[in-house]
Amino acid sequence: MALGWYELKLAKDGQFMFNLKAANSQVILTSELYRSRAAAENGIASVQKNGGDEKNFEFRENKNGEPYFILKAQNHQEIGRSEYYSSKAAAQNGVNSVMNNAATTVIKDITKS
């Protein structure tokens, strides 16, 4: 099975962030903002470590009732979150995709693009 990759990039304010992308290039998890590249790389390592275990995911709903999920580290700190989905089943499929792709070691650094 083809695995996805992490895409490390700069946010507009100069901070770092990353997306986990599935093999079809779809973003399946988005990180928070980090002040340094090293902190963002630590965030990627945390997704690699924690993203394969379903107990680290928490389902939520936005104010419009659209489901999404967050991935938490062992210290219960949020590592990343999903897009909004049309149904809980679709959100569960997103969790499954993160679980299947989290262990990838491919990191595409586009901070210089």
Swiss-Prot record:
NADP found in the keyword field: no
InterPro entries associated with the record: DUF1508, UPF0339_domain, YegP-like_sf
Sequence repeat intervals: 11-59, 62-110
UniProt keyword Repeat, yes or no: yes
Keywords for this protein: Repeat
Gene3D superfamilies from the UniProt entry: 2.30.29.80
Protein family per UniProt: Belongs to the UPF0339 family. Duplicated subfamily.
Protein name: UPF0339 protein MS1092
Organism: Mannheimia succiniciproducens (strain KCTC 0769BP / MBEL55E)
